[in-house]
């Protein structure tokens, strides 16, 4: 059985994101997979790349062939270099900077008004109406 490591496309039109999967080479692009080993979001800035290194190394060691795109991603994460024997392979994936935490200004503290309970309709007002209808009948 020929096994490939390739990209499975998800997302909307013009907004793709991919899963890095291990699948039989004869299956459809988005068909049945053996295992999902990572994610790739090319539309984010910088691109989001996440690969489970242990699983990628395992599948490469048992003969799975990566496609050109996946091979490029594995080179970025350093997994391809480790597979080829380079013990010092390092990930060159850029990571998004964390957003600073939002701190609310104490002077502009929002004012919360307590909710007022709606008064129940007075039973006295409803009772005379009921009596008047009985008198008319």
Swiss-Prot record:
Region (Disordered) residue spans: 104-137
UniProt biased composition (Low complexity): 119-130
Basic and acidic residues bias spans: 104-118
GO biological process, one term: translation
Domain of life, source organism: Bacteria
Recorded GO MF terms: structural constituent of ribosome
Record keywords, A-Z: Ribonucleoprotein, Ribosomal protein
Family membership noted in the UniProt record: Belongs to the bacterial ribosomal protein bS16 family.
Protein name: Small ribosomal subunit protein bS16
Organism: Clavibacter michiganensis subsp. michiganensis (strain NCPPB 382)
